[in-house]
């Protein structure tokens, strides 16, 4: 297995919708759109001592994805950066860390597919875990390219 469990992750704090919570308490509602119908956008970020790789590109993609899905109450890039910094600082992380940054449409007032049921705004989750790099790029990586090509939409 390329990814291994790190026992240090047992006691991490996770940012869920403005609160830093212990791993065992970090949960979203069963009425959250990510649970109801998989409605969320996410980015995977890698932390090195020099900083987060392609930080602004990740945040732009997250924002653009949320806008494309017509999310309401999207946190600003500065608000997201603040949540990431708070999470990393609270866990003493500055290297060998992977962040799963997730933005959901938020909690619904009742179950259903209609996005108008989302009345509380987006839910931001910052899950930072101690993880070594998965790929050793000095050896190259194996890639498979599909023979199927999609044309550019008109």
Residue ranges of model-derived segments:
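Conserved alpha/beta cores of soluble small-molecule-handling proteins
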Residues: 1-154
């Amino acid at each position: 297995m390329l990814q291994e469990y790190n026992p240090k992750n047992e006691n991490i704090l996770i940012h869920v919708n403005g609160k830093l919570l212990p791993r065992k308490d970090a949960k979203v509602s069963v009425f959250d759109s990510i649970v109801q119908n998989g409605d969320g956008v996410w980015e995977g970020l890698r932390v090195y001592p020099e900083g987060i790789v392609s930080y602004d590109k990740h945040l732009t993609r997250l924002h653009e994805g949320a806008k494309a899905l017509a999310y309401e109450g999207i946190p600003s890039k500065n608000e997201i950066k603040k949540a990431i910094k708070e999470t990393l600082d609270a866990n003493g992380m500055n290297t060998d860390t992977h962040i799963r940054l997730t933005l959901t449409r938020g909690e619904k007032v009742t179950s259903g597919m209609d996005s108008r049921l989302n009345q509380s705004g987006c839910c931001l989750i910052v899950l930072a875990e101690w993880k070594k790099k998965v790929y050793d790029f000095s050896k190259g990586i194996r890639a498979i390219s599909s023979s199927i090509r999609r044309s550019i939409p008109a």
